[in-house]
Amino acid sequence: MLKVTTAHIHFNRDNTPVSEQFDDIYFSTADGLEESRYVFQEGNNLWRRWLQFGENHFVIAETGFGTGLNFLAVTALFREFRTQYPDSPLKRLFFISFEKYPMSCADLRSAHQAYPQFNSLAEQLRQNWLQPIVGCYRFHFEETVLDLWFGDIADNLPQLGDYMVNKIDAWFLDGFAPSKNPEMWNENLYKQMFRYTKPAGTFATFTAASAVKKGLESAGFSLQKRKGFGKKRECLQGFKPLNAEQNPAVHTPWLLSRSATLSENTDIAIIGGGISSLFSAISLLQRGANVTLYCEDEQPALNASGNKQGAFYPQLSDDDIHNIRFYIHAFAYGQQQLRWAIQQGIEFEHEFCGVALCAYDEKSAVKLAKISDYDWDTSLYQPLNQQELSEKAGLPLPCGGGFIPQGAWLAPRQFVQNGFAFAQKCGLKLKTFEKITALSQSEKGWILHNDKNEQFHHETVIIANGHKLKQFTQTARIPVYSVRGQVSQIPTSSQLLKLKSVLCYDGYLTPADQAKQFHCIGASHVRDCEDRDFSLQEQQENQAKIQLNIAEDWTKEVNTADNLARTGIRCAVRDRIPLVGNVPDFERQADEYRNIFNLRRRKQFIPQAAVFENLYLVGALGSRGLTSAPLLGEILASMIYGEPIPLSEDILHCLNPNRSWMRKLLKGTPVK
């Protein structure tokens, strides 16, 4: 079940929200805000610890988001701390929270009315509130980052994964009373908490129930009781002892992501110039990194990111649940980042017009029927009949299909180039006509060698150069391939102007641009081809596809005869999901893991996968770069900084650059 189940609540005489699922109040009827401050902020000694904290970020995890009151209160407190102590090394707060039954937006607004001091934060929270499927969603509140996990904590907490072992500084052990919600308060929860908590990390909770106390002690926490809030006699707080096991077992060391070794200067180079480079740079700049981009062209966005119009929507697979989940989470984060870009004044043509998916033949009809079986929230996907889909498109269609109401088109080249101009104002150093031909390691990081025999030294390097990903010796064994795609630009007409949404069949057609002059139609798909010359055959095929798949009179006005087109080379991978993370050392992994099949079978020690330290990549975005790049850039920046990653571990494993080798090695098949 992917769909999020919302909470059923009512407000009692004190105007306190009450859960009908658990028959319990969300917070104290006396004063919910003061309870939050007393139990969780004071119970974890947050202010004192922040004053003494020597790291860049602090991580809080919470077991029940509810109305978000704890989050709003601690975000306000952290803003006060940053205002009073701007020179503190502590710059960012991460708040991870789990919620099985999120409130409706209307109920959330009603609950927030009691706390007008948080109006601005609460409004920002509600703007991005309900999401279509379970899993992790990241939201930015300036120096505070919220990772909100919708769904059962029993399923989601383990998905923090090996990467988050010993990374959480404080726990807000909240949620409905143990007597009302015994499924959450259990031994599994306490063991997971202990595994993720840093040595000397703390927890605080409103309850002092005997079963909770015993469970936390059994997991390894040191406990103490203190006076409870209001009428409660006692509550609990505690910590993970410093002498606790420092290196708990890693379940999948061959897929474990590694953070970078960073100096105070945090000097990072990006090799590329497309949309994945842009969002990697933005996420790093927001963390205060010194970022230099090396682009081999005269300006960014001259290859796969350079089209005049492109579609923004998730790739919905009918046979790969991890693929579906990744793209839906990427789509949600991408929407948030597009709104952010607009707020920042980054200009680009766009239209949130929706995307119509046509069941144009038997195969596509079967695929869309399978996709419809997932029982999506209608905000994400709507199965429609012929008449309904035609109404969404604004033109008659010969078939039904599906509709993605929050889909859009935007101008990729304009967006990427103006995005980089904005990034330069934020400190990005942009070097054009810099063709990096080789990478070599040094004592302090990496040396970039260009085609003019010059060298550039950087601490950390990200390879984001699209279809040229394999050009370096370190990435030569990554199993990606090139795909040539030609997009045709066609003049509009009286009929084509009626098109209201992006239309997808065995190709796609965009609505008219904002000047109402042209549409984009495409794209050809020629594997293992890097020739960018104009192809008359592909131009004619782009026209023929729509006239064959959508056999309506209006498609006769689609005319590619002007031979206006643009060709780009995409980077793709067989399993249709991008690559992001550490660059794996193929030679060492092939050697060290040659017997991993037997090591697992015998339950023997398996070392972490060999990678090139401080070298990362993002690639194989295929035809969905507009959708996936924002989340991939944020994942990469989080990984480099050792921060929480906004994605379930099982999906993150599917993005790992060494995944294809490991599938073979884990089966006992050698790789060559």
From Swiss-Prot:
Annotated catalysed reactions: 5-aminomethyl-2-thiouridine(34) in tRNA + S-adenosyl-L-methionine = 5-methylaminomethyl-2-thiouridine(34) in tRNA + S-adenosyl-L-homocysteine + H(+)
Region entry FAD-dependent cmnm(5)s(2)U34 oxidoreductase, spans: 271-672
GO BP: methylation; tRNA wobble uridine modification
Keywords linked to the UniProt accession: Cytoplasm, FAD, Flavoprotein, Methyltransferase, Multifunctional enzyme, Oxidoreductase, S-adenosyl-L-methionine, Transferase, tRNA processing
Region called tRNA (mnm(5)s(2)U34)-methyltransferase, residue ranges: 1-241
Cofactor: FAD
NCBIfam families on file: MnmC_Cterm, PRK01747.1-2, PRK01747.1-5, tRNA_MNMC2
Protein name per its UniProtKB record: tRNA 5-methylaminomethyl-2-thiouridine biosynthesis bifunctional protein MnmC
Organism: Mannheimia succiniciproducens (strain KCTC 0769BP / MBEL55E)
Encoding gene, per UniProt annotation: mnmC
